[in-house]
Swiss-Prot record:
Top-rank taxon, per record: Eukaryota
Gene Ontology biological-process annotations: sulfation
Protein name (record): Sulfotransferase 1C2
Pfam families: Sulfotransfer_1
Organism from which the protein derives: Oryctolagus cuniculus (Rabbit)
Amino-acid positions noted as binding 3'-phosphoadenylyl sulfate in the UniProt annotation, renumbered to this chain: 49-54, 131, 139, 194, 228-233, 256-260
Gene of this entry: SULT1C2
Expression sites (tissue/organ): Found in gastrointestinal tract tissues, liver and kidney.
Known catalytic reactions: a phenol + 3'-phosphoadenylyl sulfate = an aryl sulfate + adenosine 3',5'-bisphosphate + H(+); cholesterol + 3'-phosphoadenylyl sulfate = cholesterol sulfate + adenosine 3',5'-bisphosphate + H(+)
Family (UniProt): Belongs to the sulfotransferase 1 family.
Length: 296
């Protein structure tokens, strides 16, 4: 099924088991599902606009023991393949991952039910970052405005409806977060919150390092905190997507690294929208004991 888009862009999403995805991903679905994970793979898992780039840089800095030069070896989007990524004729995320030596650090936005089965079968490590739904929606809205390969989001009012109905790329925020939360006790999953990393980055970075089996001294931890601050990353051309062509990401519309704050939703939501989403959250997340922070 193709989902309609706004008038500005001709991009359409198609669905896999009810989850909207970019057409190229759907066309490559067989290769994605048959992907062979390895037991020593670490998979970074996020819903879009939940701190993917941030946690990726943190993980890379930990892996490189805080060596900034080693983290400059390639653009961030090329260091750790995004497994479902597809844009022919370029190599797919699966092909890039297959060409990597072990141990591999990989990325995905897929919900649990669409993840290639080999990740579960090989008991891989998963690092999940969740962000509160209101800030996530705002960030995704601005990202879709500037991203030329995703559907036009329309007005904020229109996007609000699209998002709460799960008709955005990678589907429902509620299903995504709930799905990963519910399996975290059965697999090697470190479940983190964007807001906690913002509040106490050193504490959360230490958790990630321990999960990765890395012991870092305080000096290295402090360096990683400094190098992965929003301000540092926004000015880092290896991270800020400034090399991505305007035909793919038009940063004159909205920067890729926009604000990186907690509570920006208050600048976008009406009181009615906020109440409506609160009610929807209670209904959709019933039985899930997550208490998201909405402001710092």
């Amino acid at each position: 099924m193709a989902l309609a888009t706004g008038p500005g862009k001709q991009t359409q999403l198609r669905e896999v088991e009810g989850v909207p995805l970019q057409a190229a991903i759907v066309d490559n679905w067989g290769q994605i599902q048959s992907f062979e994970a390895k037991p020593d793979d670490l998979l970074i898992c996020t819903y879009p606009k939940s701190g993917t780039t941030w946690i990726q840089e943190i993980v890379d800095m930990i892996e490189q023991n805080g060596d900034v030069e080693k983290c400059q070896r390639a653009l961030i989007q090329h260091r750790h393949p995004f497994i479902e990524w597809a844009r022919p004729p370029q190599p797919s995320g699966v092909e890039k991952a297959q060409a990597m030596p072990s141990p591999r650090i990989l990325r995905t936005h897929l919900p649990t039910r669409l993840l290639p089965p080999s990740f579960w079968e090989n008991n891989c490590k998963f690092l999940y970052v969740a962000r509160n739904v209101k800030d996530c929606m705002v960030s995704y809205y601005h990202f879709q405005r500037m991203n030329q390969v995703l559907p036009d989001p329309g007005t904020w009012e229109e996007y609000f409806e699209t998002f709460i109905n799960g008709k955005v790329a990678w589907g429902s925020w509620f299903e995504h977060v709930k799905g990963w939360w519910e399996v975290k006790g059965r697999y090697q999953i470190l479940f983190l919150f964007y807001e906690d990393i913002k509040k106490d980055p050193k504490c959360e970075i230490r958790k990630v390092a321990q999960f990765m089996g890395k012991h870092l001294d305080e000096t290295v931890l402090d360096k990683i905190v400094q190098e992965t601050s929003f301000e540092k990353m926004k000015d880092n051309p290896m991270i800020n997507r400034s090399t991505v062509p305007k035909s793919i990401m038009d940063q004159s519309i909205s920067p890729f690294m926009r604000k990186g704050t907690v509570g920006d939703w208050k600048n976008h939501f009406t009181v009615a929208q906020s109440h409506r989403l609160d009610e929807l959250y209670r209904k959709k997340m019933e039985g899930v004991s997550i208490d998201f922070c909405l402001e710092l």
